[in-house]
Curated annotation (Swiss-Prot):
Gene Ontology MF terms in the entry: asparaginyl-tRNA synthase (glutamine-hydrolyzing) activity; ATP binding; glutaminyl-tRNA synthase (glutamine-hydrolyzing) activity
Protein's name in the database: Aspartyl/glutamyl-tRNA(Asn/Gln) amidotransferase subunit B
Keyword Nucleotide-binding in annotation: yes
Top-level enzyme category: ligase
């Protein structure tokens, strides 16, 4: 029986590090990239006698997340100890939430192939992150433990098994990431591990009512790896079932080099962690007034912003979706539109540059919009140079790249690189005459009905003028000379 006769069933557990300055239960910095164990204290090292104190900002960020996702905010929630042994967990337990999480229910809506899908949520709870095992840190190949990350605040967002393909899982995670970034509670940096997810994957024969045995794939930190891991795991489980072998409930790791999952350990159930209430922390009381204040402070969320871009600015659904996927990019876009001029035509021009050339440059440099030397005002200046006929498309790309990398003013780049467009009819006419004289055969074919050759002539004229001819003037002169 082929894999198409089976239905994959997926639920995601997304771990999002919160953008607080200090850790969840102590005053240590949450900054990424410090020297190993530089951001630690007796609390996050788990030393005897050290007591946790809850960071209020963590609670507020968890509530904001719950409100944005349509969750019920519990007026009373409780921390619990999740007991297990691992070298990067210094206390021998993780402070998390179990029976009484801060948020319950909710949903995430995402778009795939032009259709909206909704995945329901089970809960959102607060917890502390573990440290990080670092391997091959010494000449003898020994491993070390870096506890800088231990105690960094997380929210874990748990979905119901409502996702039915790897593509749905990826789009769900993209939509959730965009919401968290818009809220300002997470930076969306999957590469640094501030947003990562576990996938619970099972398969069942189509038409069956009972879910199959699930396996959990741990700690995927890219959309590509998530898709590859789910697709491999689904195939693996189908092959086991077809061979008459059982699917063992277990925790698995994804190996990106080999593109496959491998067994890590048997899958734990709740009783394996021996949860019990955290005795060193009181219950978390969330007052109704706080909830309403935070509700009133919610920003425009990505789906609403995308709909506004389509309705007010005339952008396509795809372009609007690309812009709102990153809150910093959409804010930069808004500023550029404001600097260049209102209206759908202006917005579409700005969107084309942001989604195209700026996305390419940002991908090359790894820079976030806040670090771009090409400010919204400078992009607006480039667009005005195009509108005035001072530069053309190829020249504009050179200007944008130079400004992006150096921060120079656009008009200065145009002068320094000699990119000003030639609009003088006399100069262009001389180039047109030269091209037509050099290509009599193509001229005859054009006049015989091969009108698509106009592109060839334009290209030859632009080559003759080293790309500086004004395309509109070139086109007009060519058509006049060719008898159109």
């Amino acid at each position: 029986m082929p894999i198409s006769d089976f239905q994959v069933v997926i639920g995601l557990e997304v771990h999002a590090q919160l953008l607080t300055a200090s850790k969840i239960f102590c005053g240590c910095s949450t900054a990424f990239g410090g020297a190993p164990n530089a951001h630690t204290c007796p609390v996050c090292l788990g030393l005897p006698g050290a007591l946790p104190a809850l960071n209020r900002s963590v609670v507020e960020m968890a509530v904001r997340t719950g409100l944005a996702l349509g969750c019920e905010i519990r007026p009373k929630s409780v921390f619990a100890r999740k007991n297990y042994f691992y070298p990067d967990l210094p206390k021998g337990y993780q402070i998390s939430q179990y029976e009484l999480p801060i948020c319950e229910g909710g949903e995430v809506t995402f778009t795939l192939d032009g259709r909206d899908h909704t995945a329901r949520l089970v809960r959102i709870h607060m917890e502390e992150d573990a440290g990080k095992n670092v391997h091959d840190v010494a000449a003898d190949g020994s491993s070390g433990v870096d506890l800088n990350r231990a105690g960094v605040p997380l929210v874990e967002i748990v979905s119901r098994p409502d996702l039915r393909s790897a593509e749905e899982a990826v789009e769900y995670l993209k939509a959730l990431r965009a919401i968290l970034m818009a809220l300002g509670v997470n930076d969306g940096n999957m590469q640094e591990g501030s947003l990562r997810c576990d996938a619970n994957v099972s398969v069942m024969r189509k038409g069956a009512s009972e879910l199959g045995t699930r396996c959990e794939i741990k700690n995927m930190n890219s959309f590509r790896f998530l898709k590859q891991a789910i697709e491999f795991e689904a195939r693996r489980q189908v092959e086991l079932i077809e061979a008459g072998e059982p699917v063992v409930q277990e925790t698995r790791l994804f190996d990106p080099d080999r593109g496959e999952t491998r067994s890590m350990r048997s899958k734990e159930e709740a009783h394996d962690y021996r949860y019990f209430p955290e005795p060193d922390l009181p219950p978390v009381i969330v007052e109704a007034a706080l909830v309403e204040r935070l509700r009133g402070e919610l920003p425009e969320l990505p789906r609403a912003k995308a709909e506004r871009y389509q309705r007010s600015l005339g952008l396509s659904a795809q372009d609007a979706g690309n812009l709102v996927a990153d809150a910093a990019v959409s804010a930069w876009f808004d500023a550029a539109v404001a600097a260049y001029g209102a209206g759908p035509e202006a917005a579409k021009k700005v969107a084309n540059w942001v989604i195209g050339e700026l996305a390419r440059l940002a991908n090359e440099t790894g820079e976030a919009p806040a670090a771009w030397k090409l400010t919204p005002a400078r992009l607006a200046a480039v667009l005005r140079l195009i509108d005035a006929g001072t530069i053309g498309g190829p020249g504009a790309k050179q200007v944008v790249e130079e400004v992006f990398r150096t921060g120079a003013e656009p008009d200065a780049v145009v002068k320094a690189k000699g990119l000003a467009q030639v609009s003088d009819e006399g100069a262009i006419e001389a180039a047109v005459d030269k091209v037509l004289a050099a290509n009599p055969g193509e001229v005859e074919k054009y006049r015989g009905g091969r009108k698509n050759l106009v592109g060839f002539f334009v290209g030859q004229v632009m080559k003759e003028m080293r790309g500086k001819g004004n395309p509109a003037v070139v086109n007009a002169l060519l058509r006049r000379k060719l008898g159109d």
